[in-house]
UniProtKB/Swiss-Prot annotation:
Taxonomic lineage of the native organism: Bacteria, Pseudomonadati, Pseudomonadota, Gammaproteobacteria, Aeromonadales
Domain of life: Bacteria
GO biological process, one term: proteolysis
Role according to the record: Involved in the modulation of the specificity of the ClpAP-mediated ATP-dependent protein degradation.
Protein's name in the database: ATP-dependent Clp protease adapter protein ClpS
SUPFAM superfamilies referenced in this protein's UniProt entry, alphabetically: ClpS-like (SSF54736)
InterPro entries per record: ClpS (IPR022935), ClpS_core (IPR003769), Ribosomal_bL12_C/ClpS-like (IPR014719)
Listed Pfam families: ClpS
Classification via Gene3D superfamilies: 3.30.1390.10
Assembly, per entry: Binds to the N-terminal domain of the chaperone ClpA.
Recorded family membership: Belongs to the ClpS family.
Length: 105
């Protein structure tokens, strides 16, 4: 191999070593309290869309009820956006004002 090609190859390797992949930004999916959505419906949403068991869903629901909001999980932006749309659509289809939002983690 010529010295020029060897030098170029070594520079590419050095550059590749400097470039490190960063983890994607993460977002919290949050349920916000309201005075109208039944607690049972909130638990149902947490089980249906976030795969929580009854105990965990009840804990998060109580956090929503007493603290004003509760974190459902932390996800990449695309997954968080999808979950927010799914929960808000499901809530409206069931005539509940439950609001799901996302926040930078």
């Amino acid at each position: 191999m010529s010295k020029q090609k060897e030098l170029f190859a070594n520079e590419e390797i050095a550059q590749a070593e400097k470039t490190k992949l960063q983890p994607p930004p993460m977002y919290k999916v949050v349920l916000n309290n309201d005075d109208y959505t039944p607690m049972e419906f909130v638990v149902e949403v947490l089980q249906k869309f976030f795969g929580m068991d009854l105990d965990k869903a009840t804990q998060v629901m109580l956090s929503v009820h007493y603290s004003g909001k509760g974190v459902c999980g932390t996800f990449t932006a695309e997954i968080a956006e999808t979950k927010v749309v799914q929960v808000n659509t499901y809530s409206r289809n069931n005539e509940h004002p439950l609001l799901c939002t996302m926040e930078k983690a």
